[in-house]
């Protein structure tokens, strides 16, 4: 294939990949109904008046800024697109996820080229799909996606020129670009006026990169204007009067131990969602360590010898191990339970309530409801983790990463030597550290829900992609292991994607029936509606986000928006 034909092929493959990502996300967004906070934001904030014009959008954003919080940019976008209509919002939200996938790929490659690595773009989208905590809440639900997804896109876009400038600086080049002075300032304002932890990280990074460039004689004016813009946005974010109103209500009486506990819980939840990413990063690190050690590799009787930069391969017998048998047994048990009523999760739930919560006196109805809600998703999450661990166990066998070989390589090559010898590993380590520090900023917040780790999880994904983009690292993944990873990726996407589409469609149909019932009731002059409870609580590993109408936020907002006096839903009945 000639270079021209190869370029055309990659362009077509990239366009096809992007179209597939957009179409999938558009379908999810189309079937996801408006609910919960969406109704509050369809009205001018705290007035009960539906938004009917652009001036109402601006007025609502200002009211929110004064009374609730500083995220004025994201609130403006949310109010604007809710006013413009759901179809346009669906398309814009799908486009934002595609943009984030592209930006994560570009940061991983440290290149703004779009069409050279369609496979890396597909992998970026897949890993974001699997690894972003509470995906349905932060990337599909409108009120959540505008806060997290729509904040991450301008922030990652803003940081890309700094990243590229640092790269060319290391190659002895300079990135002046005088035309970028004003655009970078404006983009900096958007990036800084986003969400609290990401805004702080972006501002510090911008000033840090600017100072580093100045000390190395590669300073460009756009670096400083961008940093100043980010600082201006950050000030606008944190100085909002509404922040102090909300903090007084949520966190004024919370001590440092509560903040530390929130930090541990938030970081821990993120790492659980990042399990496939972390295992692949660890595998890449061990492969680099083994390559640098020069040790021969044995894979079930197959001898791999490092000869220069090539591998000499014999044969592979394969085999069944105790670990794989244990993992398969647990997987089959949980799968059988999942499709026959969830009796394993129910047994664990009842045992914890009887043996832990009851002796501690934690048996309030809300506590039991919240714990039951967690256990409703236990089996599908456990099945997901076990499938990943099985894949990881088999991949180690195919790559010859036995305990003995890993220990032998570690004795000869330290982690410091790996970082010195592998630029991709150094860059990935920086991204991982950046993600952890980005979360650490939230120690000042009264709460730290798992969804707030959104941008940090994206940084971890970029770290893995940076490793896999490096030819010296990628070559360590032998062909059978690559085939296994492709098959596993396809199965995980097919399972989670199909489940998310089906469940979202089901929730959308149920919600549409309720809206029709409300409209019929209002046409008859009635102000009270009765809904049956939606019994299906499965959420496809949190890729679907929907709360029934007995939730106070949904009920109160919908009553005000539709002019109702009461919405009645039967109480929850634990299975």
Segments (PLM) and residue ranges:
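Transmembrane catalytic cores of multi-pass membrane glycosyltransferases
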Residues: 27-87, 91, 142, 194-410, ...
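Transmembrane alpha-helical segments
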Residues: 97-108, 154-166, 203-211, 276-287, ...
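Membrane-interface micro-motifs in multi-pass membrane enzymes
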Residues: 118-166, 194-195, 373-391, 436-467
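Membrane-interface alpha helices of multi-pass inner-membrane proteins
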Residues: 177-196
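Cytosolic-side transmembrane helix boundary signature
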Residues: 406, 457-486
């Amino acid at each position: 294939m000639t270079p021209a034909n190869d370029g055309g092929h990659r362009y077509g493959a990239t366009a096809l990949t992007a179209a597939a990502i957009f179409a999938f996300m558009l379908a999810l967004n189309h079937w996801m109904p408006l609910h919960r906070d969406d109704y509050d934001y369809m009205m001018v904030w705290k007035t009960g008046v539906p938004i009917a014009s652009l001036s109402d959008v601006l007025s609502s954003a200002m009211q929110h800024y004064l009374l609730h919080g500083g995220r004025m940019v994201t609130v403006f976008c949310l109010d604007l697109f809710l006013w413009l209509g759901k179809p346009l919002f669906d398309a814009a939200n799908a486009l934002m996820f595609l943009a984030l996938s592209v930006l994560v790929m570009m940061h991983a490659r440290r290149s703004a080229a779009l069409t050279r690595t369609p496979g890396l773009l597909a992998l970026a989208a897949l890993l974001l799909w699997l690894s972003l905590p509470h995906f349905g809440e932060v990337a599909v639900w409108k009120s959540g996606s505008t806060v997290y997804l729509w904040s991450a896109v301008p922030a990652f876009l803003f940081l890309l020129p700094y990243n590229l400038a640092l790269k060319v600086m290391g190659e002895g080049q300079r990135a002046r670009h005088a035309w970028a002075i004003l655009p970078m300032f404006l983009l900096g304002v958007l990036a800084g006026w986003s969400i609290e932890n990401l805004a702080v990280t972006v501002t510090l990074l911008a000033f840090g990169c600017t100072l580093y460039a100045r000390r190395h004689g590669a300073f460009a004016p756009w670096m400083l204007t961008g940093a100043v813009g980010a600082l201006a946005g950050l000030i606008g974010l944190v100085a909002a009067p509404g922040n102090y109103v909300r903090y007084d209500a949520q966190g004024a009486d919370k001590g440092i131990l509560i903040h530390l506990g929130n930090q541990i819980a938030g970081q821990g939840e993120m790492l659980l969602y990042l399990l496939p990413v972390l295992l692949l990063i660890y595998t890449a690190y061990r492969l680099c360590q083994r390559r640098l050690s020069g040790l021969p590799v044995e894979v079930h009787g197959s001898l791999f010898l490092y000869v220069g930069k090539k591998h000499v391969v014999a044969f592979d017998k394969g085999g069944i191990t105790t670990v794989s048998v244990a993992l398969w047994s647990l997987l089959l048990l949980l799968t059988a339970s999942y499709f026959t009523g969830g009796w394993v999760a129910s047994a664990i739930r009842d045992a914890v309530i009887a043996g832990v919560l009851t002796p501690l006196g934690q048996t309030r109805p809300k506590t039991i409801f919240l714990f039951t809600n967690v256990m409703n998703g236990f089996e599908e999450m456990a099945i997901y983790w076990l499938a990943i661990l099985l894949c990881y166990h088999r991949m180690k066998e195919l790559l010859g990463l036995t305990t003995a070989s890993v220990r032998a390589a570690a004795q000869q090559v330290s982690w410091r030597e790996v970082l010195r010898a592998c630029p991709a590993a150094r860059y990935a380590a920086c991204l991982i550290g950046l993600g952890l520090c980005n979360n650490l900023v939230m120690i000042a917040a009264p709460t730290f829900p798992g969804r707030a780790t959104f941008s940090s999880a994206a940084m971890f994904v970029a770290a893995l992609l940076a490793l896999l983009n490096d030819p010296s690292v990628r070559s360590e993944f032998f062909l059978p292991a690559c085939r296994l990873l492709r098959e596993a990726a396809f199965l995980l996407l097919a399972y989670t994607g199909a489940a998310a589409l089906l469940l979202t469609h089901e929730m959308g149909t149920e919600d549409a029936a309720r809206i029709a019932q409300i409209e019929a009731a209002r046409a008859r002059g009635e102000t009270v509606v009765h809904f049956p409870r939606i019994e299906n609580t499965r959420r496809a590993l949190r890729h679907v986000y929907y709360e029934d109408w007995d939730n106070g936020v949904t009920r109160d907002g919908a009553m005000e928006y539709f002019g109702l006096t009461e919405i009645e839903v039967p109480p929850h009945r634990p299975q």
